Amino acid sequence: RLLDQRLVDAVVLDIRHCDGNALDLPARFPRIPMYALSALRPEDGTLLASCRKAGFTGILVEGVDNAVAGEWIAARTAQVARRAALADAPRLLRLTDRLQLAAWDEVLRRVGVPTKTGHVAQALRVTREHLSREFGAGGAPNLKRVIDLARAACAADLLGNPGYTVRGVVRILGYASPSHLAGAARRVAGATPLELRELGPRGVLTRFLRGRTRSRV
């Protein structure tokens, strides 16, 4: 249920209290790391083998991995993978100034919620006008378009999961309607929402760099 309501970066399942449908989750959501939690009792052996076969990212041993599990999972989330796919975006977008880079990081941090220039400016404690002017300096895209880019890249990543529909992604990312996501996908990548599924985050960035970096249309 949570996967259908909000942006989820990783899932930990206590396999002793899950029904058989839990084993289907890695196949339905391959871009979201899934971890099985177990006390490693002898009777859990068959179930653990089933988890590995189903595609779970890892097995966490209750009482043994507790101290390091949070840090270990945090380094291997869907968000980390999305950021890695866009790691060279600042260079490709000509974002070199400290304010530009801080704004880019804030845009990525807010990628799961509707974001306007004013939200980013408030987080960085500058005026909206100053941020808009400085962000687009040196040939960089305008900030509104970059916000569209980051959110469309996130939508593309989510749509890479067979368990998500376009309407489901619209709900999770807070788009007003499927047509609003379609408009963003068209502006950023010249693609339909369904085509985002094939592009992935990196493909969206590549399309964006082909002449779609300036003002909204």
Spans of model-derived segments:
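Basic/polar phosphate-binding segments, predominantly the helix-turn-helix DNA-binding elements
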Residues: T117-V146, V170-T192
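A short, Lys/Arg-enriched amphipathic alpha-helix from helix-turn-helix/homeodomain DNA-binding modules
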Residues: A89-P114, A123, R145-Y164
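…primarily DNA-binding HTH/wHTH and HhH modules…
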Residues: G183-V217
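C-terminal output helix
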Residues: T46, G63-I73, H130
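Acidic, metal-coordinating helix/loop segments flanking the phosphotransfer/catalytic sites
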Residues: R1-A10, H17-C18
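The C-terminal output helix
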Residues: I73-A89
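A short, hydrophobic beta-strand element within the central beta-sheet of small alpha/beta folds
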Residues: V11, R31-G45
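Alpha4 helix (beta4-alpha4-beta5 surface) of REC/receiver domains from two-component response regulators
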Residues: R41-G58
